[in-house]
Amino acid sequence: MKVLASVKRICRNCKIIKRNGVVRVICSSDPRHKQRQG
């Protein structure tokens, strides 16, 4: 998981969600696209 200041969708399967006040990107097609804002 990448921890970035600015999270962006990498592909069309990426979803931006907010979990416990933390913005995250989850991806069903490529787990390497996972990101967290921090």
From Swiss-Prot:
List the record's Gene Ontology CC terms alphabetically: cytoplasm; ribonucleoprotein complex; ribosome
Q: Which terms are listed as keywords in the entry?
A: Ribonucleoprotein, Ribosomal protein
- InterPro entries of this UniProt entry? Ribosomal_bL36, Ribosomal_bL36_sp
According to the UniProt entry, its GO molecular function terms are: structural constituent of ribosome
Q: Does the keyword NAD apply?
A: no
Its GO biological process annotations read: translation
Q: Which family does it belong to?
A: Belongs to the bacterial ribosomal protein bL36 family.
Q: Spell out the HAMAP family in the cross-references.
A: Ribosomal_bL36 (MF_00251)
Q: Which PANTHER family match?
A: 50S RIBOSOMAL PROTEIN L36, CHLOROPLASTIC, LARGE RIBOSOMAL SUBUNIT PROTEIN BL36C
Q: What is this protein called?
A: Large ribosomal subunit protein bL36
This protein's species is Cupriavidus necator (strain ATCC 17699 / DSM 428 / KCTC 22496 / NCIMB 10442 / H16 / Stanier 337)
Gene symbol? rpmJ
